[in-house]
Amino acid sequence: MKQIALILTLLLAAAGASAQEVFIGADFDTWFDNREHSDCNIDDSHTFFSMRLAPKAGVIWSEKNQLVVAVDLLQDFGDKEHKFLSKVDPQIYYQFNSKTAQAVAGIFPRSLLLARYDPFFLGSAYSFYNNRIQGLAAHYKSQTGSFIEFALDWEGMRSYQTREKFR
């Protein structure tokens, strides 16, 4: 947490020194899914009820470039295992924006993707609880609204216990 605060302080100091645009903001989301059912052998009964807050700050330069630092704060309601928050994750990413193209690299929210995938591929609970992409994404959007998008999510670093995993 101290490292994130230091990075944010340096980012804001550098932005002020070079007279670039500094911004702050936050994203907020909640999730409720009551999966209480009886006599089902496929899945256990349970209820998902959570909230997520992601305060962010960053620098914009040349109108098309952004460097963003955020903290993703997740709280599962009724969670007795954690004293304060259920999960805290960093988001640090570079974003390029133009009228027809966007590119993002780093650790960034899944909400920056244009495509909304069917729950068959990415379940709604999976998308909420795994809302960050660690990798890169790019898309091109035509004037008619059609688009092509590429995203690479590096979910697992190779170690003695795990294999590399990309999605």
Q: Which role fits each region the language model picked out?
A:
Residues I60-K64, N97-A101, Q143-G145:
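Outer-membrane beta-barrel channels and translocator barrels
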